[in-house]
């Protein structure tokens, strides 16, 4: 649904969980890595979407809308295993090299920064 659409954080509302329990991680991602410009793969689940961005960040977004906006449940830096699973479940046989490079860079910035 969201794949290759520009990421617009103004269309997302932070969840209570994100605000109360994950705000440090959210801010670290925003300051050190960035959320990216587009989603490279989106996995649709029962009540949510798991979206991998072009910077290697996973955003978990509710399917429900509130006043035209979706709830950002949480966000975290992806792993190669998670990205592989997301791509495979979306019908892609192989993880693109630019995605694995982005994930490795994101994890290095997060840990080393």
Label every model-predicted segment:
Residues 1-113:
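Ribonuclease/tRNase effector modules and their secretory precursors
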């Amino acid at each position: 649904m969201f794949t290759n659409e520009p990421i617009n954080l103004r269309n997302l509302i932070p969840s209570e969980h994100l605000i109360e329990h994950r705000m440090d991680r959210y801010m670290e991602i925003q300051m050190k890595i960035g959320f990216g410009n587009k989603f490279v793969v989106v996995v649709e689940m029962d009540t949510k979407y798991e979206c991998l961005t072009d910077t290697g960040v996973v955003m978990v977004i509710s399917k429900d809308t509130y006043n035209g906006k979706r709830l950002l449940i949480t966000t975290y830096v992806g792993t190669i295993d998670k990205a592989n699973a997301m791509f495979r479940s979306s019908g892609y046989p192989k993880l693109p090299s630019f995605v694995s490079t982005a994930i490795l860079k994101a994890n290095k910035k997060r840990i080393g920064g």
